[in-house]
C-alpha cells in the first residue's frame, strides 16, 4: 500500500461543478473586458459628444498630488542667460536633468535630493536621451544608456543604479560618433536598443549603430544616414552644413508594430518600417491631404486653417491599444487627427475585427478629428494662485464640434507646443502657451471609460466621451513624462492591478506630479465629498452607478474593498477637504462601498427574451444575474488577469538536455494578487447574510412568485460558485508560495520527484486550471506527496508540514494526505517489526492518523487500509476505521434521514448514503472472512469484532448489519439481539419484508408487549405483503388471543379498540375462507377459473361487499350470503328472504339430482335446521315469521304419502325455536289469510300444522321427569281459544278433516283436564 497510489485522493467530488461554474463566470467576465470596443470603434462616429467638464472636484479626471521645487543650485544654473541650457525628465530612473553648456546635472525630481553632475565633456550639450541598451553588448548591471549629443559628437554612457541607495553611476563605454554639422534636435530609441536621431534643419534621418565588437566589414559604432543616398554615409556632416530642406521636427517609434514616424517642418508625416537590416519608408502623408480630409469630416473650422495651423507632435498608438488607429497627429490648435493604417483603399470606419497583419501599412488616412476643449484664460489664470488645492479647480462645460462659441467667458485658441502628447489609455495633455508671461497652460482630457463601456454593454454604439480640465502650474513646461504606465488598454481592468497613471510635469519652477483618477478613484473621491453636498453620499454613488452601470459599479466598489484605491488621492483629499462631515476615515469608506455594493447591485431576474415562461428545472439557465454577481466576477477576473492564463511552472531544457522545473510566477506579484482576493473573500464571508443569493437559496421558497424564487436560486448558485473559486485561488496561491519556499527542498526537486505524467501536466497547466480543475487537484496532491517524501528523507517532522498546509491551504490541498502518508508508513513498519507491543503501537498510531484524515478517504482508500489491517490480524481496528470513515463522509448524517424517508429518487442524500454503505461493506467482508475461519484465534477475534459492532452507536450501520444478517439467512437471530436499534429496524422493514414482519410480533411477545404485538399481527393480517389467507386468519387469531393477556391499565382502552378491529377482520376472513373452500369444491366452475378465483381469495382480506357481489351471490352460495348479511348487519329483508328461498330451492334441486342420499324434503329440513342453529340469534338474517312462512309454503307444495305431517315444526323445534313462537307465527298466518294462505286446502294445511305443534307442545309441558324450569311455558287459555277457532273452521267433519278434528277435540279435553 503506497501513498503514491492514485486511489489515495484528497479530492472533494462535490466541488468540481461549482468550480467549473465559477471558472466559466470568470472567463465570461474576462471575455467581456476583452471585447470592450477599441479606440477605432469608439471614434467610428464623425461627431463626438461634448467634453464633460466636472464642476465637483471629486469627479475631475486628474488631481495634483504634489509639487517639488527645483533645487536652488539647479535654479541658479537655469537662470544664467549667458548659458545654453535645456531641461528634461528621465522617468525610467526618476531623475530630472538640466544641461548647462557642456555640463549635465541630474537630481531626484520626487524628493529634490540626490544631486549629481557629469562634467567630462568638451563641447556644449545640445540633446540628451536615456535609452535601453542592446542585448548582450554591455554587462548586465548596465540597464540604461545615456545618449549625449554635443555640437561635435554623440556618445553613450552606461548608467547603473544602486538598489539600496538609489545612487547613479556613469560608465564610459568608449562608443561615440561624430555629428559635426548636425545640430541634433531629436533622439529616440526602440525597445531593442536601436538609436535614431535627426538634426535641426536637416532633412535626413540618422541611426546611431553600435555593436559589441568590430567586424570585418563593420565598425563597432557608426552613423547611418537612413533617408539619404548611399554616398551620404561616407561624406562628413560638415559638408552638408547649412543644407536647406524639409527638416525633421520629431521622431517617434511604435515598438508594437516596428514602425518609425517622422514629423517634418512642413507638418508632413512619414512612416518607416523597422527591419533587422535597416529602415524602409512605407507611407508619406502630406499636411495638405490631412487638412483636406479633416475639413471633409468636420466642415470648415478656424482650427483647421492650414495658414495658421501646423502639426506639432506625432503620437504612435500601440497595437495593444488599437489595431486600427496607428497614430495621432496633434495640431498647434489642439486638434487631434486620428489616422488609420491600411494596405490599400480603406474605409474611414473600418470595423475592429478587420485583421491587420504584421506587414507595414501602405497608407495612412485621417478618419477622425477631435477638437480641443475651449481655453478659458480668465479662470485658468486665477487658478494658478491655488496650486496646492487642486480639488477646487473650476472648469466649465465645453462643446466638441463648435470651436467658435459665444459665451460670457472669453475663450481663445490653443497654441500647443511639441510637448503635447497622448499617453496610455488615450490620456491627452495639451501644452499651450498663454498670452501672458506667467507660463504655459496645461489642458488634460481623459476618456470616460465607464460610460463608454456601459453604452456598449447596453447595446448603444459607443462614442468618444471625454472629460477635461486644466491643471494649474507655474512656469513654462520643459518636459512631461508618464511615470506610471500600463499596457492594458482597458482602464476598467488595469485599475485592479496597476497604480494609476501618474505624470511628472517639469517647469522652470518645479516638478508637478499629476495623477489620473480612474473610475475606482472617482467613486472614492465622490463618496468622500458626498457629506458636504446636498445630494449626500447616496446621490453621488447613485450618479456613479448610473454612469457606469450596475455591474461595473459593483466591480468598482469591490475594487476599493480589495485595496486597489490610490492612497495618494485619499491622503491628499483628506488634507484638502474642510469640515467635520467630509473627514471620512479609510474604514468608513470601506463600510460605505460595501453598503452600496449590496444595495445598488440589483436583483437577479428571468430574462423573458430567452425564456418561454415554463418554469422547469432548466429555467435557472435563463436567469439574468444581478450586478453583484457580474461585478464580483469582473473583480476576480481583473485581479487575477495577469496570471490567469499563464503557466504555473516552466520547464527549461538545460545544456545537459535535462529538464529543469522552476516557478513561472513572481512571488511578490501573486502575493499582491492574493491580498486583493483575500479582501474580497473576507468581505463576502462577513456579509453573507446581507447579500441576496449568498444568505440562503431558500429565501423565497413557498413564495407565490415562482420567477423570483427561481432567480434567487440561480443567483445563489452563481455567487456560491464564485465564492468557492475565490477561496480556492487564495489557498492555491498560499500552496504555491509554500511550495516555493519550503526550506526543505528546491522547487525543481519537488516537481521532478513526481511521475512523468504529472510533470507534463505541471508544465502545461495554467493558473486557472490549477486552481479550479480536477486535474489541478491531482497535480496538487502529487506535489504534496513529493514534498512529504523529500521532507521525510531530510529527517523533518511531518506533523509540521501537515499543520502548515492545513493552516495555509486546508481546503485547496489536503493536509490530510500528509497524515495518510504517515499512517501508511506506520503500517509498513508494523508489518516489518517482530515485536508485538511495537507492532500494536504502530497499528494504533496509524489508526489515529487515519481517523484525522477520515473525511477525505474514498472507498478505495478505505479498502486498501482495511486490507492492510486484515493482513496484520487487526480486525477490530479495521472495523473501527470503517465506521469512523463512514461517519466522516456524512458529517451531517444525511444518509440516515434518506433511509428513513424511504430513499426517494433523485435525492442529493443518496450520494452520502451510498458512500456510507460502501464503507460498511468492508466490515461485512471482515465478518464473512471470520465466519469462514475455524481456528480458536479466529473465534476470539470474532467475539471482539461482534462486541465492537454491538457497541457502535452508528444507527445506519446497525440497520445495514441487520440487513446483512437477513441476507445470510440468519433472520431468526435478530430477535435475540439486545440493541436500541433493532426494534426500529424491525418496525420499518416489517411493511416490506415478510420474514421481518413475522419476527416483529414475536419480538414484542417475547418482551410481553402484547398490545404492540396485537397491532403488528393485525397489520400483518391486513398488509399487502404476500401472506396466504390461512396465515392472516392465524395472525388475527393470535391477536385475538393476546387481547385476553395482561396489559398496562393505560393501554387497556386502546387494546379493546384493537380487539374490535381484530374481531371484525377475523369474521370477514372466516367468511372469505368459506367462499374459498366452496369454490375449490365447486365442480360447476371450470378448473382454470376455479384456480384463478382461488388465487384471488387466498391472499389479502377482501371487503364484504366484494365477497358478496363478486363471489358468493353470483355463485349461489346462499349460506355464505347469510353469513355476509349477518357480519355486515345488513337489514334488507327482501334480499335476505330471497336468499332463504334460494337456499331451499337449491337444496331441493340438489337432492333430486343426487343419486344417493335423503329425499328433497329431508335435505331441506336438514339444511333449515343447520341454518336456524347458526343464524337464529341474528334478527336481521333470521326473520322467523317470514322463514316459517316460506318453509310452510314449500311443505304444502311437497305434500305426499312419503312426507310426514308437521316436519317443518319438527325441524324448527329441533333447531331450538320455541313452541310458543312457532304457534304465534302459524296462528297469525291462519288469521291473516294472506296469499297464498287462502282457500280451504291451504287453511286446512295450516290447521293440521298447528294441531301437530299444539300436541307436541302440550306433551312436553306435562311430561314427567322434566324440571319445571326446563318446561316451555304453555298459555292454556290462548291455546284453547285457538282450538275452538280451528274446530269451528273445520265444521262438520268429512273424510279429510275427520282425523284432524278428532285430534283437536281430544287435545282440548286433555288441556282442560291438565289446566
Curated annotation (Swiss-Prot):
Name listed for the protein in its UniProt record: Probable nucleoporin C890.06
Family, as annotated: Belongs to the non-repetitive/WGA-negative nucleoporin family.
InterPro entries assigned: Nucleoporin_Nup133/Nup155_C, Nucleoporin_Nup133/Nup155_N, Nucleoporin_Nup155, Nucleoporin_Nup155_C_1, Nucleoporin_Nup155_C_2, Nucleoporin_Nup155_C_3
GO molecular function, one term: structural constituent of nuclear pore
Primary location class: cytoplasm
Location(s) in or outside the cell: Cytoplasm; Nucleus
Domain of life: Eukaryota
Source species taxonomy: Eukaryota, Fungi, Dikarya, Ascomycota, Taphrinomycotina
GO biological process: protein import into nucleus; protein localization to nuclear inner membrane; ribosomal subunit export from nucleus; RNA export from nucleus; transcription-dependent tethering of RNA polymerase II gene DNA at nuclear periphery
A single cellular component GO annotation: cytoplasm
Keyword Cell membrane: no
Keywords: Cytoplasm, Nucleus, Transport
Amino acid at each position: 500500500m503506497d501513498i503514491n497510489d492514485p486511489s489515495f485522493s484528497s479530492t472533494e467530488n462535490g466541488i468540481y461543478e461549482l468550480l467549473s461554474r465559477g471558472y466559466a463566470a470568470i472567463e465570461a467576465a474576462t471575455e467581456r473586458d476583452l471585447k470592450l470596443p477599441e479606440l477605432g470603434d469608439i471614434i467610428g462616429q464623425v461627431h463626438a459628444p461634448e467634453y464633460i467638464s466636472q464642476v465637483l472636484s471629486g469627479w475631475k479626471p486628474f488631481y495634483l498630488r504634489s509639487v517639488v521645487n527645483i533645487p536652488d543650485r539647479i535654479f541658479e544654473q537655469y537662470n544664467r542667460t549667458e548659458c545654453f541650457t535645456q531641461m528634461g525628465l528621465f522617468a525610467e530612473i526618476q531623475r530630472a536633468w538640466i544641461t548647462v553648456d557642456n555640463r549635465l546635472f541630474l537630481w531626484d525630481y520626487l524628493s529634490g535630493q540626490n544631486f549629481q553632475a557629469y562634467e567630462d565633456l568638451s563641447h556644449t550639450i545640445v540633446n540628451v536621451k536615456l535609452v535601453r541598451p542592446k542585448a548582450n553588448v554591455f554587462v548586465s548591471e548596465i540597464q540604461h544608456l545615456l545618449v549625449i549629443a554635443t555640437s561635435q559628437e554623440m556618445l553613450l554612457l552606461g548608467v547603473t543604479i544602486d538598489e539600496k541607495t538609489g545612487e547613479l553611476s556613469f560608465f564610459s563605454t568608449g562608443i561615440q560618433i561624430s555629428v559635426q554639422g548636425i545640430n541634433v534636435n531629436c533622439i529616440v530609441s526602440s525597445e531593442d536598443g536601436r538609436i535614431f536621431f535627426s538634426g535641426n534643419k536637416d532633412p535626413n534621418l540618422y541611426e546611431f549603430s553600435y555593436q559589441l565588437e568590430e567586424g570585418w566589414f563593420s565598425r563597432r559604432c557608426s552613423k547611418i544616414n537612413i533617408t539619404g543616398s548611399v554616398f551620404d554615409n561616407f561624406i562628413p556632416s560638415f559638408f552638408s552644413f547649412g543644407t536647406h530642406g524639409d527638416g525633421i521636427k520629431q521622431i517617434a517609434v511604435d515598438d508594437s508594430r516596428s514602425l518609425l514616424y517622422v514629423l517634418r517642418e512642413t507638418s508632413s508625416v512619414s512612416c518607416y518600417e523597422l527591419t533587422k537590416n535597416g529602415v524602409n519608408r512605407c507611407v508619406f502623408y502630406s499636411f495638405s491631404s490631412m487638412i483636406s480630409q479633416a475639413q471633409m469630416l468636420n466642415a470648415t473650422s478656424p482650427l483647421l486653417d492650414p495658414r495658421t495651423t501646423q502639426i506639432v507632435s506625432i503620437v504612435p498608438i500601440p497595437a495593444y491599444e488599437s489595431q486600427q488607429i496607428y497614430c495621432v497627429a496633434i495640431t498647434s490648435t489642439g486638434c487631434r487627427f486620428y489616422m488609420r493604417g491600411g494596405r490599400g483603399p480603406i474605409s474611414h470606419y473600418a470595423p475592429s475585427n478587420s485583421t491587420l497583419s504584421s506587414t507595414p501599412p501602405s497608407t495612412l488616412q485621417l478618419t477622425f478629428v477631435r477638437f480641443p476643449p475651449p481655453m478659458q484664460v480668465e479662470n485658468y489664470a486665477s487658478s494658478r494662485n491655488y496650486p496646492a488645492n487642486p480639488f477646487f479647480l473650476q472648469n466649465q462645460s465645453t462643446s466638441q464640434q463648435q470651436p467658435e462659441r459665444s459665451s460670457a467667458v472669453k475663450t481663445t485658441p490653443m497654441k500647443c507646443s511639441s510637448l503635447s502628447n497622448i499617453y496610455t489609455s488615450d490620456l491627452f495633455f495639451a501644452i499651450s502657451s498663454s498670452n501672458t508671461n506667467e507660463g504655459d497652460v496645461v489642458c488634460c482630457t481623459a476618456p470616460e471609460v465607464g460610460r463608454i463601456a456601459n453604452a456598449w454593454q447596453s447595446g448603444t454604439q459607443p462614442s468618444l466621451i471625454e472629460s477635461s480640465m486644466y491643471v494649474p502650474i507655474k512656469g513654462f513646461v520643459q518636459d512631461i513624462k508618464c511615470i506610471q504606465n500600463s499596457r492594458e488598454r482597458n482602464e476598467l481592468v488595469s485599475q485592479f492591478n496597476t497604480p494609476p497613471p501618474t505624470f511628472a510635469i517639469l517647469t522652470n519652477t518645479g516638478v508637478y506630479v499629476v495623477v489620473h483618477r480612474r473610475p475606482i478613484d472617482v467613486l472614492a473621491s465622490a463618496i468622500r465629498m458626498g457629506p458636504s453636498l446636498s445630494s449626500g453620499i447616496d446621490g453621488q454613488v447613485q450618479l456613479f452607478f448610473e454612469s457606469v452601470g450596475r455591474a461595473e459599479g459593483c466591480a468598482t466598489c469591490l475594487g476599493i474593498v480589495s485595496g486597489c484605491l490610490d492612497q495618494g488621492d485619499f491622503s491628499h483629499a483628506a488634507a484638502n477637504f474642510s469640515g467635520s462631515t467630509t473627514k471620512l476615515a479609510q474604514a468608513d469608506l470601506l463600510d460605505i462601498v460595501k453598503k452600496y455594493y449590496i444595495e445598488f447591485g440589483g436583483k437577479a431576474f428571468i430574462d423573458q427574451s430567452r425564456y418561454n415562461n415554463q418554469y422547469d428545472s432548466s429555467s435557472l439557465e435563463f436567469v439574468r444575474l444581478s450586478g453583484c454577481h457580474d461585478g464580483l466576477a469582473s473583480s476576480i477576473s481583473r485581479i487575477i488577469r495577469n496570471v490567469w492564463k499563464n503557466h504555473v511552472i516552466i520547464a527549461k531544457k538545460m545544456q545537459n538536455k535535462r529538464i529543469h522545473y522552476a516557478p513561472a510566477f513572481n512571488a511578490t506579484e501573486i502575493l499582491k494578487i492574493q491580498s486583493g482576493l483575500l479582501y474580497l473573500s473576507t468581505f463576502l464571508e462577513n456579509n453573507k447574510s446581507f447579500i441576496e443569493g449568498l444568505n440562503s437559496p431558500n429565501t423565497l421558497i413557498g413564495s407565490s412568485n415562482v420567477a423570483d424564487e427561481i432567480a434567487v436560486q440561480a443567483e445563489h448558485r452563481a455567487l456560491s460558485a464564485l465564492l468557492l473559486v475565490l477561496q480556492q485561488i487564495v489557498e492555491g496561491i498560499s500552496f504555491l508560495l509554500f511550495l516555493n519556499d519550503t526550506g526543505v527542498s528546491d522547487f525543481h526537486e519537488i516537481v521532478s520527484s513526481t511521475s512523468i505524467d504529472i510533470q507534463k501536466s505541471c508544465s502545461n497547466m495554467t493558473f486557472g486550471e490549477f486552481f479550479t480543475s480536477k486535474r489541478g487537484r491531482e497535480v496538487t496532491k502529487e506535489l504534496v506527496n513529493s514534498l512529504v517524501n523529500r521532507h521525510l528523507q531530510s529527517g523533518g517532522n511531518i506533523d509540521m508540514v501537515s499543520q502548515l498546509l492545513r493552516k495555509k491551504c486546508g481546503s485547496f490541498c489536503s493536509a490530510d494526505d500528509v497524515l495518510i502518508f504517515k499512517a501508511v508508513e506506520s503500517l509498513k513498519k508494523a508489518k516489518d517489526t517482530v515485536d508485538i507491543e511495537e507492532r500494536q503501537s504502530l497499528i494504533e498510531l496509524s489508526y489515529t492518523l487515519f481517523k484525522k484524515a477520515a473525511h477525505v478517504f474514498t472507498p478505495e482508500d478505505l479498502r486498501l487500509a482495511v486490507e492492510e489491517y486484515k493482513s496484520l490480524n487487526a480486525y477490530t481496528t479495521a472495523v473501527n476505521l470503517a465506521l469512523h470513515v463512514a461517519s466522516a463522509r456524512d458529517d451531517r448524517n444525511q444518509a440516515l434521514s434518506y433511509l428513513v424517508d424511504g430513499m426517494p429518487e433523485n435525492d442529493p442524500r443518496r450520494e452520502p448514503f451510498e458512500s456510507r454503505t460502501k464503507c460498511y461493506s468492508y466490515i461485512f467482508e471482515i465478518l464473512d472472512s471470520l465466519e469462514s475461519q475455524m481456528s480458536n484465534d479466529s473465534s476470539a477475534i470474532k467475539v471482539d469484532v461482534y462486541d465492537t459492532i454491538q457497541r457502535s452507536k452508528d444507527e445506519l450501520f446497525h440497520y445495514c448489519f441487520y440487513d446483512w444478517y437477513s441476507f445470510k439467512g440468519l433472520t431468526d437471530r435478530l430477535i435475540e439481539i439486545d440493541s436500541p436499534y433493532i426494534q426500529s429496524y424491525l418496525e420499518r422493514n416489517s411493511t416490506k419484508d415478510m420474514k421481518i414482519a413475522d419476527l416483529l410480533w414475536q419480538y414484542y411477545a417475547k418482551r410481553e408487549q402484547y398490545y404492540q404485538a396485537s397491532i403488528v399481527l393485525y397489520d400483518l393480517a391486513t398488509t399487502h405483503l404476500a401472506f396466504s389467507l390461512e396465515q392472516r386468519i392465524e395472525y388475527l387469531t393470535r391477536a385475538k388471543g393476546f387481547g385476553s393477556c395482561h396489559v398496562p391499565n393505560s393501554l387497556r382502552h386502546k387494546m379493546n379498540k384493537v380487539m374490535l378491529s381484530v374481531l371484525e377482520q377475523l369474521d370477514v376472513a372466516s367468511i372469505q375462507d368459506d367462499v374459498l373452500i366452496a369454490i375449490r369444491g365447486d365442480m360447476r366452475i371450470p378448473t382454470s377459473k376455479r384456480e384463478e378465483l382461488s388465487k384471488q381469495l387466498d391472499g389479502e382480506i377482501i371487503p364484504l361487499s366484494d365477497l358478496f357481489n363478486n363471489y358468493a351471490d353470483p355463485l349461489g352460495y346462499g349460506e355464505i350470503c347469510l353469513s355476509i348479511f349477518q357480519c355486515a348487519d345488513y337489514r334488507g329483508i327482501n334480499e335476505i328472504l330471497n336468499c332463504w328461498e334460494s337456499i331451499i330451492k337449491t337444496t331441493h334441486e340438489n337432492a333430486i339430482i343426487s343419486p344417493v342420499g335423503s329425499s328433497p324434503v329431508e335435505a331441506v329440513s336438514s339444511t333449515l335446521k343447520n341454518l336456524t342453529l347458526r343464524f337464529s340469534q341474528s334478527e336481521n338474517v333470521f326473520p322467523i315469521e317470514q322463514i316459517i312462512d316460506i318453509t310452510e309454503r314449500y311443505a304444502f307444495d311437497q305434500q305426499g304419502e312419503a312426507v310426514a305431517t308437521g316436519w317443518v315444526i319438527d325441524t324448527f323445534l329441533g333447531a331450538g325455536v320455541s313452541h310458543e313462537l312457532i304457534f304465534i307465527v302459524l296462528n297469525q298466518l291462519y288469521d291473516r289469510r294472506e296469499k297464498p294462505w287462502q282457500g280451504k286446502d291451504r287453511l286446512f294445511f295450516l290447521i293440521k300444522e298447528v294441531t301437530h305443534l299444539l300436541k307436541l307442545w302440550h306433551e312436553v309441558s306435562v311430561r314427567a321427569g322434566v324440571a319445571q324450569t326446563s318446561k316451555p311455558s304453555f298459555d292454556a287459555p290462548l291455546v284453547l281459544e285457538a282450538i275452538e277457532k280451528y274446530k269451528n273452521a273445520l265444521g262438520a267433519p268429512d273424510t279429510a278433516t275427520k282425523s284432524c278434528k278428532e285430534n283437536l277435540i281430544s287435545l282440548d279435553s286433555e288441556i282442560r283436564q291438565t289446566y
